[in-house]
């Protein structure tokens, strides 16, 4: 689904205050939506998408993986609690093996 497809689906369900994560590489990590309109992102997919971007930029696999985890932890996960005042903050789903 494209971002616009997701927006259209959200609007059809009456959710106009759902917050998307800004990084476009995270759009492929959207795995669903809660009953009350929170987008659900898969953490492993978020990491893998950033690793792909970083390796294309020249980092080796280990550096890219470490950088991706650090970036998501610092710039995304830390920010989620502050998003609540702007709308329905995203939820990050973790695999059991993470």
Task: Mark where each language-model region is.
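C-terminal alpha-helical interaction appendages
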Residues: 1-98
């Amino acid at each position: 689904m494209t971002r616009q497809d997701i927006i259209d689906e959200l609007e059809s369900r009456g959710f106009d205050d759902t917050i998307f994560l800004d990084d476009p590489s995270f759009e492929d990590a959207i795995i669903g939506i809660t009953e009350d309109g929170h987008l659900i992102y898969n953490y492993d997919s978020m990491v893998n998408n950033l690793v792909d971007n970083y390796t294309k930029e020249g980092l080796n696999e280990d550096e890219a993986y470490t950088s991706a985890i650090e970036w998501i932890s610092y710039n995304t996960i830390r920010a989620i609690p502050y998003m609540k005042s702007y709308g329905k903050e995203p939820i990050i789903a973790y695999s059991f093996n993470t």
